[in-house]
Amino acid sequence: MINFTVGPVQSSEEVRKIGYEQVPYFRTSEFSDIMFENERLMLKFAKADDDARTVFITGSGTASMEAVIMNTLTVEDKVLIVNGGSFGQRFVDLCEMYEIPYSQIKLETGKALQEDTLEVYNGKGYSAFVVNVHETSTGVHYDMKMISDFCRKNKMFLIVDAISSFLADEFNMKLWNVDVMITGSQKALACPPGVSIIVLSKNAISRVEKNNPKCMYLNLKSALKNGERGQTPFTPAVGILRQINARLKKIESNGGVEKETEKIAALAEDFRKKIKDFPFEIISDSMSNAVTPLHPLTASANDIFLTLKDEYGIWVCPN
């Protein structure tokens, strides 16, 4: 079986071997050391400020999306959400659920966010900006510098879902003044699904500390407090966190986040060159290195999916 899906992706032999091992007890100094190292490397690879923190949630990326919305935003905010597909819609649904005032920038499928579209919302009193930097459902990667400039100009709190693009595309929390970054274990981190990761700036931590959401499992204040001792409030996905540790250390020993991004970019470019003479059209205005969104011109996506799966042992996303 070969995964050519956006996630889960192919894991290394080293990561898979850890999955075969007996899961150890975790309320120990040894596991705390692993978590401290995970936090250090995540902050390094996200290019976060020295006073930023990392939270590891046992749950999918959506769990961390929900945790961020409920812990950093309130009914006193006025939020602007980029909605370019199903994951942008997820943020809309979360703000609706928690009764957080919002407006959405609704984009056509495959279309990138443009500066003139943003300009309509300039100076309109928005306090926070929420975006999936890579809208995985359509394969569109948004211009983070443009978004960052807009948020700086309007003094907006910036939340970025980088679940499918972290490590695949350039990302710089400090340079782009990002307050919250979210990612997941099963995308370019190339580990099994089950853990999502939140990187919080000092400004975001301040919001978390002032907020009192009605939740237990996704309470980031509790998660940050426990993280000070290298632990989590509740039983975490111990095995996956050990796999993440091995993967992060491997990225560091191979030259760091820049080398990893270059490698993934080269793979994306090679595939796109090879596919261009086949009967497909690319439906994204601006692609991430993580995904090549193709529309088949001579067959159904589901038929291609089934043929690759059943006859070749290759998995792709049929949607």
Where are each of the predicted segments found?
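Active-site phosphate-binding strand-loop segment of PLP-dependent enzymes
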Residues: 112-167
